[in-house]
Amino acid sequence: MRVVLQPAYVLHSRPYRETSALVEVFTPEYGRVGLVAKGVKRQRTHRFSLLQPFCPLLLSWTGRGDLVTLTGAEAAGPIPVLTGEGLICAFYLNELLLRLLPRRDPLEALFSVYAHSLPSLIHAQQRQQILRLFERDLLAYLGYGLILKYEAGTSRPIEAGQWYSYQLEKGPVRLLSEDLEGMKVRGHTLQALARGALADPASLGEAKRLLRWLLAFHLGDKPLKSRGLLEELRRLGNVSRKEERP
């Protein structure tokens, strides 16, 4: 199979043999794809300089199976200037995609969400909301979408002033007892998450705890490296301790 000029972003790359690299990319029509980039490390070729995370690309490849051979790479736009926490947040998005996306599953809408999220991470005041909405959309496109408008198993709308216990694989259940399993969350937060408008710190905090809890169920026990990286940068004094990790 030959693919020509497919929009793509590099999620991760690692050396392969002496002069090549194995590159994981995210594309709209083919989802996550594994590429062999032959000879790209030889004298730091132009193609090697292009195959960097967060750079919008147009890639061409040939082959079948889990690994295909890269035949062409072109820049499709500028790389967003990400530093500090913004850069780590972008790596966090990449890590989620690497860990959760299956190979060769087309996800055009999620690709669009990712492409629009990256430049928004430049702005510190938007980062936490951008991350929460990306997590929400990622779960939805993978088939694990949150129930945010109605109580689980009913047609009763979520009430802003009510507390709920969000339960795995079920959804929000009206909180009548502190003994219920699940994640405690306000109806106001569920409504804000449904609208994509997490304006107040309390809703952002609750949404972060809820989504992290839900993602942990699918990620398993292996910790995310991006979270540890932010802690290390904080230890070295490169990131303010007031800045929240992903």
From Swiss-Prot:
Keywords, alphabetical: DNA damage, DNA recombination, DNA repair
UniProt superkingdom: Bacteria
GO BP: DNA recombination; double-strand break repair
A GO cellular component annotation in the UniProt record: bacterial nucleoid
UniProt keyword annotation of DNA repair present: yes
InterPro entries: ARFGAP/RecO, DNA_rep/recomb_RecO_N, NA-bd_OB-fold, RecO, RecO_C
Matching Pfam families: RecO_C, RecO_N
Family: Belongs to the RecO family.
Known function: Involved in DNA repair and RecF pathway recombination.
Entries under NCBIfam families matching the protein: reco (TIGR00613)
Record PANTHER family: DNA REPAIR PROTEIN RECO
HAMAP family assigned to the protein according to its UniProt record, in alphabetical order: RecO (MF_00201)
Protein name: DNA repair protein RecO
Originating organism: Nitrosococcus oceani (strain ATCC 19707 / BCRC 17464 / JCM 30415 / NCIMB 11848 / C-107)
